[in-house]
């Protein structure tokens, strides 16, 4: 299967309702301007289009670093059930403790089939509703797919009440959709074992998502053929996890949810400018920060896992470090001046370039073993 880049699109708050509609329309206009001339299209246009660059050699070189000892499972299967209250430190830092507390209240009400919640806080910042809904959509993907909530229109600061309406499902069928998602989440997490470290967990979940899901070209290229509610569903993390179809912020939100469930610090990052509109993830592994782009690794590759800022910007079709944002916050501001620069995973872009790639964890030696056909390459997962 030949590697091809995917279309680029993004939405900062992800929902095509109220204020978000304008943002998504802007994104679609940017993407429409860039997609001309692309083969399956992502990025800018013309001679500098990264999709026009030669595809990396479809080879994977063996290395003596691959252990000769047969990996043996040494850890028990992970005991897991979905926890919609879990979030990440980066998310909490981005939106604030009050928004996280409010998000948990919204989630609890939604899971009961309710369509409003009264918060009862003493005061509300102007960005309170936006931050709360942003957090809810990442902590509870079913809310994104089956609830329509405009953070400004549907919040009344004078009463502290936030409202939403159920969409894409009959109210009496919501429980069935929740059960489906929870079963899928359990299946995703089944690749992990008790005691797996952060790097092992991240590699396994990333591989599970990129090898399973596909890019939804129809939703991206022909949104006019979908109703607003259908578009919300098709571009949700719920869709990419349950139906195996999504676009860039579907993949990015799914990674944020999965990482939160696996106790990995993670948040989405986007870039919107005249050349590109795209969304991916910022992830923290063993004390270092990296960028990961599951959308561009669809098919089960690792070309965009564990990138530095320089690697993220290089051959990206127009991504610029100064245009990167989580909500309205730059990654550098979010990380208190830290710029992702650790090159630990650069070897993957040198040695693991074919698709599909399978990854297994040698838990005896704490190594990740990447295999294509009969050839393998391994890296250390140790701290």
Where are these regions (language model features)?
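Short, well-ordered strand-loop elements centered on a beta-strand within folded domains, enriched
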Residues: 236-238, 245, 288-294
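Hydrophobic/aromatic-rich core segments of domains that either
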Residues: 250-315, 370
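N-terminal accessory/pre-domain segments preceding catalytic cores
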Residues: 34-37, 41-199, 203, 315-383
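Secondary-structure boundary elements
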Residues: 174-240
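Helix N-terminus capping/helix-initiation residues
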Residues: 96, 113, 197, 216, ...
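Generic recognition of cysteine residues
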Residues: 10, 31, 42, 102-103, ...
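Gram-positive cell-envelope targeting signals
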Residues: 1-74, 205, 243, 247-250, ...
